[in-house]
Amino acid sequence: MQDRPWDRDKDYDTLVKWWTDWEFGMVPKECLPPDGIVVEVDGKPICAGGLYVGEGTQFGFMEWIVTDKNAEQRTAHKCLKICIDSIMKLATDKKLKLVYTATKEQALHKRYTKYHNMVLTESNV
C-alpha cells in the first residue's frame, strides 16, 4: 500500500467512478482542493481524500473521502487509515491548527474517533 498526492486531472475520472458507484453527488474538478491523497495497492487506486486549506489561516477542511466500492473490505479499511493519516500529516506539514470534516456516514464518524484520535464536536447537522 502506497500513498501519493492526488492529481486532480489524472485522478478525476477515478473519483467520479467511485462517487457514482456509491451514489454520491459529483464534485466539479475545479472545486476539488489542490491537496489530496490517493492510496494504491500494486498501482491500483483504492481510496482518496482531499484537504482544503483556508487561505491566510491555519484551518483545514478534510473532504471527499471515498473508496473503490469493489475493493476488498479489509484492504479498503487499511488504505483508508493510510489515507486519513496522510491527510492529517499533510495538515501538520502545512502547520494547520484545526482540521474539520463533516459526514453523515456513521462508519466514518467511528473511524475518525477510533483510529485517528479526532473529536466529534457536532452531530445530526
Summary of predicted features, one role per range:
Residues 99-110:
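Conserved beta-strand-loop-alpha-helix junction that forms the acyl-donor binding cleft
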Residues 93-96:
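Short, high-confidence coil segments that cap the C-terminus of an alpha-helix
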Residues 3-4, 24-27, 117-123:
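Short secondary-structure junctions
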Residues 110-118:
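Short, aromatic/basic amphipathic alpha-helical patches
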Residues 54-63, 71, 75, 120-124:
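A conserved beta-turn-beta hairpin within the catalytic core of GNAT-like acetyltransferases
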Residues 16-42, 47-67:
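A conserved beta-strand-loop-helix scaffold within acyl/acetyltransferase catalytic domains
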Residues 1-15:
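A short beta-loop-alpha structural element at the N-terminal edge
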Residues 67, 73-91:
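Conserved acetyl-CoA-binding loop-helix of GNAT-fold acetyltransferases
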